[in-house]
Amino acid sequence: FTVTWTRSADGIIRELSLAAPAGATDAARAGVEITANAISDATVAFPTEEIGVGARWTVTRQVDDAVAPTRVTTYELVDLDGDVATVRSRTEAPDPQDTLTAPAPDGGPGVTLDVESYDVSGSGELTVDLRAAMPVGGTTESSTRTAYVDPDSGRRSTYEEDSELSFRTVD
């Protein structure tokens, strides 16, 4: 597998592409895609103005999420040693939609569900070498908890996902 991304000077990944070997299974492709997107989400977006230790800034970005397409991340610079920065982050998904509309897999009529609850949160502390392609140390954690209700049947569905992404330098 080859994962390629273009990161702008502020740290935001602007383009992400994946290339899989010809014999790769769909499951392997999906796993690499999930990991690549997680790494992309874990990058630190720095402000364009100069900052110092103790600085806090907030970044709002759009994501591929039909219920809560906006993510708001607040960062804090906790240490800076030359080109190496340690940054804490906290992420949330404000203002989720009241309904989720999804196409049917067979191309038939779509499905609309009421969103009973939708909570997305994340936090972490990363060590970022400003000369490196990705963080060189640290961990981020994220959690998603959702509950949907079919308005026709009253059937309730829940979804829970927890993930942790750790970075470390290997010598």
Region spans (language model):
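Low-complexity, intrinsically disordered segments exposed to solvent
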Residues: 1-83, 123-125
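Acidic, serine/threonine-rich low-complexity disordered tracts
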Residues: 59-171
